[in-house]
């Protein structure tokens, strides 16, 4: 069940300003898995031309307007065979930000690295869930900028153990390849015992009530 809160201005005006009245809705819809990957990781295109969000904008908020700039590049990437776009920063087009509707994580050595919340990245609920669980499991976490060059270097050196995305619709999904500047970066193959799979199992068990929720994340609806 996918649950999406929605708030929109409902004032009867065409004036270019904030509305004085709003309507709040909650949309619930049964959905299938976001990626029909059949156990395989997804294929991302690191976008170095188009930008999802820039400093000083609304990239850190879940606003409908943020999707406008992504529609054409997402359509183009899907036509080219990619599952999603890996968005880079809007200034240098070097630093990883997020992957489509997901926050992104890299398991490098004994550390989990994820882009920090700098105002252009959504503070995803699943991101927070993943970080909380990883800290409870004893993993070292770094929330910081990470450049594609660092990812490539870590992969070549054998230090990149896996990469995965996390979001409300996708839950947790492994990343198999990243296309960057005309080249494919093949990431380490992950299996049933990967960290990504462990996180997926833990989160879905919490969602379905199989595992006890000690965080107050689940709410019983009568």
Annotate each predicted stretch with a short phrase.
Residues 6, 13-222:
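Helix-start/capping segments and mature chain N-termini
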Residues 1-8:
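Extended, Lys/Arg-enriched charged tracts that mediate electrostatic binding to polyanionic substrates
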């Amino acid at each position: 069940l996918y649950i999406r809160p929605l708030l929109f201005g409902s004032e009867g005006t065409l004036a270019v300003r904030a509305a004085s009245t709003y309507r709040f809705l909650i949309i619930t819809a049964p959905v299938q898995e976001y990626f029909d990957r059949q156990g395989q990781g997804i294929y991302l295109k690191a976008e170095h031309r188009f930008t999802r969000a820039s400093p000083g904008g609304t990239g850190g908020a879940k606003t409908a307007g943020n999707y406008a700039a992504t529609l054409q590049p997402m359509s183009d990437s899907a036509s080219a065979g990619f599952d999603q776009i890996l968005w880079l920063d809007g200034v240098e087009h070097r630093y990883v930000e997020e992957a489509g509707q997901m926050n992104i994580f890299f398991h490098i050595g004994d550390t989990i690295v994820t882009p920090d919340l700098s105002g252009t990245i959504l503070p995803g609920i699943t991101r927070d869930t993943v970080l909380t669980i990883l800290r409870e499991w004893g993993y070292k976490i770094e929330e910081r900028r990470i450049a594609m060059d660092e990812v490539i270097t870590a992969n070549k050196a054998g230090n990149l153990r896996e990469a995965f995305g996390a979001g409300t619709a996708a839950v947790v999904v492994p990343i198999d390849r990243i296309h960057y500047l005309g080249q494919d970066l093949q990431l380490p193959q992950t299996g049933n015992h990967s960290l990504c799979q462990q996180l997926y199992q833990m989160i879905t068990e919490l969602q379905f009530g199989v595992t006890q929720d000690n965080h107050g994340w689940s709410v019983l609806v009568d």
